[in-house]
Amino acid sequence: MLSPKIRQARRARSKSLVMGEQSRSPGRMPCPHRLGPVLKAGWLKKQRSIMKNWQQRWFVLRGDQLFYYKDKDEIKPQGFISLQGTQVTELPPGPEDPGKHLFEISPGGAGEREKVPANPEALLLMASSQRDMEDWVQAIRRVIWAPLGGGIFGQRLEETVHHERKYGPRLAPLLVEQCVDFIRERGLTEEGLFRMPGQANLVRDLQDSFDCGEKPLFDSTTDVHTVASLLKLYLRELPEPVVPFARYEDFLSCAQLLTKDEGEGTLELAKQVSNLPQANYNLLRYICKFLDEVQAYSNVNKMSVQNLATVFGPNILRPQVEDPVTIMEGTSLVQHLMTVLIRKHSQLFTAPVPEGPTSPRGGLQCAVGWGSEEVTRDSQGEPGGPGLPAHRTSSLDGAAVAVLSRTAPTGPGSRCSPGKKVQTLPSWKSSFRQPRSLSGSPKGGGSSLEVPIISSGGNWLMNGLSSLRGHRRASSGDRLKDSGSVQRLSTYDNVPAPGLVPGIPSVASMAWSGASSSESSVGGSLSSCTACRASDSSARSSLHTDWALEPSPLPSSSEDPKSLDLDHSMDEAGAGASNSEPSEPDSPTREHARRSEALQGLVTELRAELCRQRTEYERSVKRIEEGSADLRKRMSRLEEELDQEKKKYIMLEIKLRNSERAREDAERRNQLLQREMEEFFSTLGSLTVGAKGARAPK
């Protein structure tokens, strides 16, 4: 019999041991909801430090803290583990714990990954399966090593690019570039590249090394298939694929359109590609270009475009909910879409990303960037210099969609020079050339986008054509002035007409996004730039350049005659404006202003009407598609209900037949029982009468 003091001491000791399980991490428990979203959650078994028994707890990973709860629905956690300065280690099952999936979280930072000390402060956890344990270990390592440059497997692409920005501008993460460079150097002629799997243990070791912030180097002893499997694993474990989940249906629609009309589908696909986030755009372009290099050796490595599309399609383009029905329905479309992305990558990715910032030089400069393009021309014109230098012939394929913009400084002290202009390329197929001198030609396949370099202010006219008709040299005494000064701005010569083409924003940077967006306002766009006019007519006549219009794939066939007539009227108006100079430069003709305003108003109305009609048609088609989808769902639901009713009817018929048979059997049994009762009573009566007769003679 223990005394009360001993019992009280034991209770206090056991209570302190239990409470010690909750206070493993020193410091005050942080609020879980303030640490961001849940990175991972699930059931794990935790071993107590003293009693060594297992307790099942609900673990939640938020930020750099691992909380555990008694139940899934609990709000207040029982305890937490701070992952800063810790390491996670997988433990092999021992003789005492056979078949258990154990891992340990113990103190230790970078450089101590290979050490597994027997630390009494380590937390031993057990998962329900090997896959569950691997997922938990990867998630915890990602949290531990992400601030140190690791944990890239399963990390969002934007976060990886943002962290690696300190190493300089890159088109893809360092892991992808390292794998691609190694395969490009040693594996392009390897048979079955990307199809044959690598060594699983080596892939796992490389993944752990990259996740722990290390940068392992590949040498001649490294297996090419292992590196290829590592690259596929990185793409597969991205939380959101290269093509985001929100764009999955849009890209599948492009694939369906490609099967019907390849030209329209390619144009729509280029538009969807250009709308991707910049990190996704760069990585997709990098991978497609590399896969095109791989398929160039298909006669040796046996990996054609279709094979590469089959391997990489599900890793680059996958639905958010990966159910078997959705995957089976989209497999062929994804493969076809990936094939087009590889084959036509030079046409679809037309805006190259600059390698890095370049220092401005004293001559002509042309910089083309993803999502933006600017043509900067130095305005250091010499008096009496040559009239027009040779320029390049540039063509923009109809499938190329580039959104090009530049911001010009404004202010009371800023000047607009004719030597520095912003040019925006539309989505029409166009070309411009000078019949006398050509210094370059467009590259085949639209793999690169060449921008004309002109010594004086260039023009973009209606269908994206650059007309040199308005280029004039300023004489030696001419100087640039503001828009309200002596020299007046010509709408046709020096600025793109705002609202004429959806792909051409005005000088005030008013964007026109697709045919479904509203038209940009044209007011006030003519007063943000100045123009240079020449002083002699000989210079004007020498600067005349012809331009030719190629067929432009407009969305509506009824729009072509109006556009051609409008082009012709604009050409005549521009020629008349350039040949008929006013006698005094500071007194512009009112007729010219009225004509330009009328043409601008007409074009704006036509574009607005077309935009409105197209928007209505798209809404109607969308409503019809939604109604059709609802009807199909209702039909399928009614068919299911009809099948159920048929089954119920059959069951009722069977029950009815069974009940009839049971009733007939019951009637037969009743009749038989009635006959037996009658026989019994008759026999009983005869026996009674016989007994009475036998007693009577006595």
Curated annotation (Swiss-Prot):
Question: For the site Arginine finger, which positions are given?
Answer: R195
Q: Does the keyword Cytoplasm apply?
A: yes
Which keywords are on file for this protein? Angiogenesis, Coiled coil, Cytoplasm, Developmental protein, Differentiation, GTPase activation, Nucleus, Phosphoprotein, Transcription, Transcription regulation
Among PROSITE patterns, the record links this protein to: PH_DOMAIN, RHOGAP
What protein is this chain from? Rho GTPase-activating protein 22
Q: Which domain of life is it from?
A: Eukaryota
Q: Which CDD domains match?
A: PH_RhoGAP2, RhoGAP_ARHGAP22_24_25
Which residues, by range, are in coiled-coil regions? 590-687
